[in-house]
Design a protein with these regions (language model features):
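Condensing-enzyme catalytic core mediating Claisen C-C bond formation in acyl metabolism
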Residues: 1-56, 153-221, 225, 261-267
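Claisen-condensing/thiolase-fold acyl-transfer catalytic domains that form or cleave C-C bonds
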Residues: 2-36, 64, 90-91, 99-135, ...
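Short, solvent-exposed loop/edge-beta patches enriched in aromatic
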Residues: 15, 70-80, 132
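Active-site nucleophile and cofactor-binding loops and adjacent substrate-binding regions
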Residues: 55-59, 85, 106-118, 165-167
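Short, well-ordered amphipathic alpha-helical segments that serve as non-catalytic structural scaffolds
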Residues: 59-75, 123, 210-226
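Short acidic capping loops at alpha-helix termini that bridge into adjacent secondary structure
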Residues: 77-83, 134-135, 229-232
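Anion-binding (especially nucleotide phosphate/pyrophosphate-binding) glycine-rich loop
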Residues: 78, 84, 88-94, 102-103
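Disulfide-rich extracellular domains of secreted proteins
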Residues: 215, 228-230, 241
């Protein structure tokens, strides 16, 4: 213990004063709204351009809306936010730069690809746990059309995608992290930080295969650091089963691995 928390193993921390997630705001595109998680989103947009002239502006608009929803639901103002940890998939973080411009909150721009939300929550929780902020905003966004332009081919090019190609989410999530003891919807008991694991995947159409080795390594590192055995696990589910699992989360203590799996410990 160092006054802030206990380091556990190679890459994990258990917070001495676990911060809470006070509120969240979520915005999705039309395709995402039609999926199994659609009913959990605060706002499903009928227009993926959000009424803007281009896709990049649309992604910025999603960030503005998600942040606004999180603040409104938490009955908080921009002036009460000490820091913002936010990011997107674009060069120079342009969606975040323009999307956060209207918030007037000190910003740490993050670029962690699909780990950005987990990274934002982790760094935000560390900041609050250490006493450097009372309220911190964590946010991440992506947009199918902007990601296609950035990493593959612009939609106007008309490139043919294989049926097995993964689809970048059009959406944004924002969460307000507050101090231990405050009313919240979840508690961040600790974090496990992942590392780069390159398995040699070179198919730009298969993002899942490229990310899976690092995600698996992080999960296994968490179990090792916290000395969790398979006997302590009550269940595990992929993101396909999240809708059913989510309904059981209330008043229960879970560890959530963003975009990968949900685990529950008997003695967490």
């Amino acid at each position: 213990m160092n006054g802030y928390g206990a380091e556990k193993g190679r890459a994990s921390i258990l917070f001495e004063h676990p911060p809470v997630i006070k509120s969240v705001g979520t915005v999705s595109g039309t395709r995402e709204g039609q999926g199994p998680l659609g009913r959990f989103f605060d706002s499903v947009e009928p227009d993926d351009k959000m009424g803007m002239e281009n896709w990049e502006e649309a992604e910025s608009a999603m960030q503005e809306k998600a942040a606004g929803l999180a603040l409104k639901k938490g009955k908080l103002t921009e002036q009460e936010m000490d820091y913002s940890f936010a990011g997107d998939l674009l060069g120079q973080l342009i969606a975040t730069s323009f999307g956060s411009g209207s918030l007037h909150v000190p910003l740490f721009g993050l670029y962690g690809a699909c780990s950005t939300m987990g990274e934002a929550l982790g760094l935000g929780a560390m900041t609050v746990n250490a006493g450097y902020g009372k309220n911190v905003l964590a946010m991440a966004s992506s947009h199918f059309a902007t990601a296609e332009k950035e990493f593959r081919f612009p939609l106007a090019y008309g490139n043919q995608r294989p049926k097995s190609a993964t689809w970048t989410v059009t959406g944004c999530g924002a969460a307000v992290i507050g101090k231990h003891g405050e009313k919240g919807i979840a508690q961040i008991a600790g974090i496990t930080t992942g590392q780069v694991v390159d398995a040699g995947v070179r198919d730009s159409m298969n993002m899942g295969a490229a990310m899976a080795p690092a995600a698996f390594h992080t999960v296994m590192q968490n179990l090792k650091d916290l000395e969790i055995t398979k006997e302590q696990l009550e269940g595990a589910g992929t993101t396909r089963s999240l809708p059913g699992i989510w309904e059981k989360l209330e008043n229960r203590h879970w560890q959530i691995f963003y975009g990968m799996r949900v685990w529950k410990r008997k003695d967490f």
